[in-house]
């Protein structure tokens, strides 16, 4: 199991079996992160959808938005989202990520976690429209939150990493095949976190 002390935060691959993960702790400096946080918070077309869990319908415990450079919808957990046009601000962030990913992303799913009660349950980003072995680029602004992973078969394999404001976290290779991930609720006093997950819809 990976020792948290092994996380260098400089993009060095993290040593988890069946996963390809990279973490850049300070990909954006503090001023950049604060400015992006404020602008995205104020200008995003936020929505809150209903979601079905074990046959029961709930309001999704976070706010979301979808932007893309095309009109292709994105579906997950019974929710179908239709994208807004990619903004100049989001394209600016995407271009920065391209420099270290060599991937042309088409779409960004944005999540706003308003406080510690907002969460995102165990799941994998393995929807058909993402293709095989997708690359997901996750950018965080605002409050820090723990990102949890657990292996699908080897239940004892669990890991968590604190995603800090201004950080960039990649999930690549067979990560979505072998691992689930979540943002869990927390009783700690935390402020708003905005998370952008860039992906390629095919």
Feature map (PLM): residue ranges:
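Non-heme Fe(II) oxygenase metal-center motifs and adjacent flexible, charged/small-residue loops
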Residues: 1-202
């Amino acid at each position: 199991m990976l020792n948290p002390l092994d996380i260098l935060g400089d993009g060095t691959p993290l040593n988890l079996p069946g996963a390809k993960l990279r973490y850049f702790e300070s990909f954006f400096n503090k001023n950049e992160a604060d400015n992006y946080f404020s602008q995205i918070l104020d200008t995003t077309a936020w929505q809150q959808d209903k979601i079905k869990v074990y046959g029961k319908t709930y309001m999704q415990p976070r706010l979301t938005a979808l932007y893309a450079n095309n009109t292709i919808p994105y579906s997950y957990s019974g929710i179908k989202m239709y994208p807004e046009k990619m903004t100049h601000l989001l394209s600016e962030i995407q271009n920065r990520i391209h420099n270290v990913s060599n991937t042309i992303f088409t779409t960004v799913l944005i999540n706003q976690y308003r406080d510690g009660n907002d969460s995102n349950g165990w799941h994998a980003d393995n929807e058909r429209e993402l293709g095989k072995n997708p690359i997901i680029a996750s950018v965080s602004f605002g409050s820090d939150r723990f990102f949890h992973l657990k292996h699908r078969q080897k239940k004892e394999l669990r890991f968590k990493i604190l995603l800090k404001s201004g950080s960039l976290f990649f999930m690549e290779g067979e990560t979505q095949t072998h691992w689930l991930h979540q943002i869990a609720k927390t009783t700690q006093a935390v402020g708003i976190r905005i998370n952008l997950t860039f992906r390629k819809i095919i």
